[in-house]
Amino acid sequence: MRFAAIADVHGNYLALEAVLADIRAQGVADIVNLGDMLSGPLDARRTIEILMQLDAVHVLGNHDRYLLDRPPEKMGSWDRPAHAALNAAQLDWLRAQPMTRVFREQVFMCHATPDNDEVYWLDTVHPDGAVALSPLDRIEQFAQGIAQSLILCAHTHLARAVRLRDGRMIVNPGSVGGPGFRDKHPFPHVVEAGTPHARYAILELTDGAWQVTFRHVVYDHEAMAALARRNGQPELANALAMGWIR
């Protein structure tokens, strides 16, 4: 089994197009998408048009859920413009996607953790704002009851692979479209990828073991940075331009 995992596109259609081209160039046919597809000050409509035509397996992220279960006046600055850009058929397509699913019997997919789409799985935010790899005991608690040998998550925008003591693997492929962001929960913190590249992962099962290849893809990030800046999001513009929000 060999497939690509993408996540956290956040309306960055140019990054998505570049990643899909790279996936094809690597000879990979199957794709799974771990959610947070559209929200952001970029181009939700172009992004969902690409995703709806893509032969892929999808799950929803927390921002996808916000687009479906919150009234526009209660949406945040990333969700409101995305919602306004989508038509009824596109929202219906989004609504049809599950929160979790199993891919080909061996891969468990979720956006954040199996039971909560807003909690970091592989990383912990400390009171001083530092973001670091979580203790293995905490990581394994979230994985209880999952039978699949490979577990995929996203949400943090940080590419990671963690092997559990029982041999299962948890992989976060990183973010296709958002190399940095600021959040307030559980403590104020920033996440910064350090480069503006679009990120995804290729997973391959070989002789009973999962091999992970993280890919960093060059694309016209300056165009997306300019769009974010025009739409009043200077920190995201910095992240898209450089991989740093500060």
Predicted regions and their residues:
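Glycine-rich phosphate-binding loop signature in dinucleotide/nucleotide-binding domains
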Residues: 23-28, 103, 144-147, 202, ...
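N-terminal active-site segment of His-dependent metallophosphoesterases
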Residues: 1-56
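Active-site environment of divalent metal-dependent phosphoester hydrolases
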Residues: 10-15, 39-42, 64-69, 102, ...
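Active-site neighborhood of phospho(di)ester-bond hydrolases with catalytic His/Asp-centered motifs
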Residues: 6-7, 31-35, 40, 57-62, ...
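Anionic-ligand binding region
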Residues: 133-164, 168-173, 183
